[in-house]
Amino acid sequence: YLTGSLKSKPDLSFETSPSPKLKNILESGLPTESSPFIKKLLKKFPPSELYGKSVKDKRGGKNNIHSWDIELKGAVTEEEKQLLNILLKERRKKKWASEIGIDWMDGMPLTKAQISTFYKHPDLQNILDSLTDKGYLVLEHPKQKIGGQRIKDESLPKGYNIVSGKKSFEINKILDPNDVAPTLVAMDMEHLFVVDNGGLRTLTGKEGLRLFGYPDDYSFDIPKKDRCDLLGNTVAVPVIKAVSERLLHTL
C-alpha cells in the first residue's frame, strides 16, 4: 500500500501475529461440484492428498498435478509419462534457445533429434505421435519475439511442445485448510477449490468475504462471476483499518 502524510512520517511498523489458517473461515457440509475433470482427479487422488496441490502443465514440482497424472486427455503409458516429465523441464533450458536460433522463452518446442539427446528410446517417434494424437503434445514452429509479441517462425523446423496455458483447467489450485490462503486475484478466484464433504467445491461468497476481513452480515448477493471479480480486486479490511488508524495519529 502507498501512504502519504503532509508533515510527519506515520509509524507503519506492526507487530506480527500468528497467521490464521484457512480452515478457520471455511464452511462445511456444502454441495460439491461434479465434472469429468473432477471425477478423473478424485479417481487418482483421495481428497486428503489434494491439499495445496496445483493443476498445471506448465511447471513441475511436488505440489503440482499434471493432466497426464490423471489421464485427462487419454490413457498414458509409464514411458509416455516419463517423457512428458522430462520434456517439461528440458524445454525451459536456455541452451535450446541458442541452438534453435530464438530468444529464450518459458517452454520451447524441441525437435525429435533434440529430444533424443535426453530421452533415448527405440520407439521415440511412436511415443511422440501417440502423445500428439491425444493432445498432450503439439507439433509447432518455434516463436520469435517481434514487437513485444511471440510470432511463429515458419522458417524453423517444427518441434514438440507440451500443451499448456493460463487457466488450462477448471481447477487451478486446491487450497490447504491447514495453511494460509494464497494471494487472491480476479483471474483465479473461480478456479480455486476446497475439499468438502469428500468432494471439491469453489469458495462461497461468505468464505471469500471472510478472507478479506468482512463481517458475516455484509451484504454481497451478486452473481458468482461478479463476486469473484470484485473479491479478486478488493483489499483486506483489517489491513486498511490498521494503516488508517496510524495515519490518523499524524493529523
What kind of region is each of these model predictions?
Residues 1-74, 78-88:
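Flexible, glycine-/basic-rich loop-and-beta segments that form/coincide
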